[in-house]
Amino acid sequence: MDQGGGILELHKDLKMPHTMIMPDFGMSGIAHLDGEHIVVSVPEAVMVSDVVTDEEGIMLETALEAEVVEEPDICQEDVITTEGVIMSESILGAEVAIQEALSGTADLIEETVPDQVFVAELMSPHIQSPLDHNLVSAEVMVTDADTVIDSHDTLQSDVTIKADDDVEDVKSTSEDYLMISLDEVGGKLDIEDTSLKISADVGQDDDGSKEDEFSSEVIKVYIFKADGDEDVEIGSTEVVEESDFPGRHTVMESVGSGRLPREKMVYMAVKDANQEDDLNCSEMTDQVYMEVIVGEEEAPAITEAQMEDSPVNKTIVPAAWATAYGSSLESKNGAATPYLQITDSISTSRALKQKIKKRRRGETRQCQTAVIIGPDGQPLTVYPCHICGKKFKSRGFLKRHMKNHPDHMFKKKYQCTDCEFTTNKKVSFHNHLESHKLIIKNEKIPEYTEYTRRYHEASPLSSNKLILRDKEPKLHKCKYCEYETAEQGLLNRHLLAVHSKNFAHVCVECAKGFRHPSELKKHMRTHTGEKPFHCQHCEFSCADQSNLKTHIKSKHGTDLPFKCGHCPQAFADDKELQRHAEIFQGHKTHQCPHCEHKSTNSSDLKRHIISVHTKDFPHKCDVCEKGFHRPSELKKHSETHKGNKVHQCRHCDFKTLDPFTLSRHILSVHTKDLPFKCKRCKRGFRHQNELKKHMKTHSGRKVYQCQYCEYNTTDASGFKRHVISIHTKDYPHRCDYCKKGFRRPSEKNQHIMRHHKETLL
């Protein structure tokens, strides 16, 4: 038998034999005879063209090979009037039945076109209607392997997808996805609430003349196979015209047999030129096709140069291959998009009657032509390659496919024109450019550079206009070091990374650091806009008290009633003037008995004595027994205990909020055990800090022991500060403005910045 195709002729004495087309799953060369059925074994890659050739034959063409076995002793029964074509469900993934009716001439099988796939429940009202020889209809029949078609009850011709038990293993190893395109050509067929369009040919008369009521149509069923290891021409088709009907239909070019399937395609192209103008779709191709995408192995990308040499008719190329062939049916934005946006809530007739809007020249034309149904019955999302346009059902297959484009994978988006630095991160590229600016910051930046073009083209947020720089940008300088940058954000990151250790309190808005929380609180007012200090003489308000004093001195200095006789400063209150005069003249009447400290009032002197010269804490906390010098401090501390669980000691009245503090209390007070042991001298301590102090005696470093208390340290400066601040009455560092004494110069400088800032301006 010819390898290009086979012809199965029907004798006139045979009325209607059964023709069964089944896929070849390891049964090549074996014909199955079952009573009145003629079994034809056909491989997966096959083209079945049901084209009218003459009155006595039906042509069966195969792309690879087909074996036809005829049984000479076939018994015919007059009661059998059904012609059935049984195909395995694993090929199409859905149960489809194509129903064809014969014309008035019983010897000639007319060409029919199934324009829509229906569910059996939708077609139930039409099955009961009597058969009309001029009617072409379509039906879905769901049958099992043991279903018997009753020829006495129906006179219609069926194409049934049969669920074969022999191919269960094949179905379980692959996931096929069915894509069905809804045709927009033909007449209307109302099924329940859905208005669908079908088109068909009427039968011929005995003299061979055609009626002009419907236009001529062609049915093509292609099954494509493509191997990823060879460069083949896939999708080659030939449009059969009306003049080709008497002759033999040309077999399509296909790939050889014995290859693993990459993409399997069942394609049926329907063309009706008379009804294109009614649907405003004259430029689009009417398609009915089913596509199966199997992702077992990678297929090579198809370039535009290969497609120009290929004899593929692009007017009937499926939408899934349009991008690979260089068509503009789909955009190459690289996003995962479904094939069709039609859901169950949208009626099919509404989707079929959508008018295609005219687009401007140069824009892509997109048409809802297909839907991919996954194994769960839901629309499938595909992931296209933004380089070659090939689509995949998962991100994993797309990532594996991207290895075929190594030039695009390892190509960096940002390239420095001054050196060989490349990166994919915009921030890294910007920081690198800042390093060049610091070196040549005195040089003028050219008006337009290659960096300006590349940087703004690569940036997704950049506009289409090129930025021309004709002057040097403003540089933000760090006030703590010599760092300079053109962006405030980079300066903030520099402050956090470099100077945050010296400034423990950092502003979360601008990353500016401060040594004291009061300075940070004052600074935060510049971001919040809060101005708590108001002038009593006008509506002026500010965020800093020193600024308010400066305002009063400069604006209302001559208007204030109480003026100082020794300086130009004036006050609105007599007490403020008296306090200022006492501080300025140095007349402090309240002398500390323990040191040379003097205060202007008794309350200040009392605070001084309690905080400096006494170790007594008369105000105890009832919860944790912590002591404080003043009641205000105890009240502030008591707020921390509200809403917290109090841990009570079992041996005494000690209470605490911290369970670890309670454990230390029990170990140190109620037990004689010394848990912290020295490894050198085996001496025990109740607390870990006591052990640390003891370990300094074994380190070989000099230990400074205070002669007035048990304080000891290895730091000479720390020991000196301890003696001066605790055990001496001398305040050698005096303020130049108020004569207040301090033990350390840093305390004096801090005092001047807080209280005498206006005098420094």
From Swiss-Prot:
* A single Gene Ontology CC term: vitelline envelope
Under the heading SUPFAM superfamilies, the entry gives: beta-beta-alpha zinc fingers
Ordered alphabetically, the record's keywords are: Cytoplasm, DNA-binding, Metal-binding, Nucleus, Repeat, Transcription, Transcription regulation, Zinc, Zinc-finger
**The keyword Transcription regulation is annotated on this UniProt entry:** yes
Binding positions (Zn(2+)): C564, C567, H580
Cysteine disulfide partners in this protein:
none
Give any GO molecular function from the UniProt entry. sequence-specific DNA binding
Q: Which domain of life is it from?
A: Eukaryota
Q: Name one Pfam family in it.
A: zf-C2H2
What InterPro entries does the record tag this protein with?
Answer: Transcrp_activ_Zfx/Zfy-dom (IPR006794), Znf_C2H2_sf (IPR036236), Znf_C2H2_type (IPR013087)
What's a BP term from Gene Ontology annotated to this protein?
positive regulation of DNA-templated transcription
Q: Where does this one sit in the cell?
A: Nucleus; Cytoplasm
Q: What is its main location?
A: nucleus
Residue ranges covered by zinc fingers (C2H2-type)? 383-408, 414-436, 476-499, 505-527, 533-556, 562-584, 590-613, 619-641, 647-670, 676-698, 704-727, 733-755
* Reported tissue expression: Present in ovary and brain but not in other tissues (at protein level).
Domain remarks: The sixth zinc finger contains a Phe residue, Phe-584, instead of the final His residue normally found in C2H2-type zinc fingers. There is another His residue a few residues downstream, His-587, but this is not involved in coordinating zinc. Despite the His to Phe substitution, the zinc finger retains the ability to bind zinc using a tridentate metal-binding site of Cys-564, Cys-567 and His-580. The zinc finger also has hydrolytic activity against 4-nitrophenyl acetate.
Family statement drawn from the similarity comment of this UniProt entry: Belongs to the krueppel C2H2-type zinc-finger protein family.
PANTHER family per the UniProt record, alphabetical: C2H2-TYPE DOMAIN-CONTAINING PROTEIN (PTHR24376:SF243), ZINC FINGER PROTEIN (PTHR24376)
Job of this protein: Transcription regulator required for brain development. Probably acts as a transcription factor that binds to the promoter of target genes, leading to activate their expression.
Indicate what this protein is called per its UniProt record: Zinc finger protein 711
Organism from which the protein derives? Danio rerio
